[in-house]
Amino acid sequence: MITLADNALTTPDRLMILQEFNDDQYDLVAMLINQASASIETELRRKLRKQTYSERITPTGSQELLLSQWPILQVDHVVIDGLELDSSEYSIEDNGILYKDDGWPWRGYPFGLAYDPRATSRNVSVVYTAGYILPKDVTDSDPCTLPADLEGLCMEMVQASFGKLQSGGNAGLISFAISDVRWEWATETPASWQAVINKYRRWA
């Protein structure tokens, strides 16, 4: 039996609310969910599942420190040049930003006519928890926090691919490999799908 990946954005049982599948199609549906979920994360340029991260970052000297993942749920500690900051010295903002009133100091020197920074150092270390509770990880005490439109996008991608396979049609299909569920479609990405991607994509 195919196991759902750690980053699977929906489950076969939840998909069955929208479309009926036979028991012998479970593995195919699970494979399509895994592939769609991975594709979504690739397009978003970020991870979605709740987990703990440890990062070393080069600050820009501004008041905002951009972490790679969000939403930030908890910051365990922040260290600058070997000294740990008190949690009162910064605040958690939207889109993976830690805000510090007196700025995040960078180490280096300006160079050239444009004063481009040189010899910069990743002198800030952050350990934090970020992400969403996915449908497959739900418990009585931890409900799903994944935005509905992201799960809906995954469901639509699986339904579209499943329908194409079931119909036997290959219009617009460039390539397909069932072994690892890779495919490309000649048709353009639906505007509604792209809108969801743009809403949650990491741009910086």
Give each language-model segment a name:
Residues 1-204:
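Divalent metal-cofactor coordination and adjacent catalytic microenvironments
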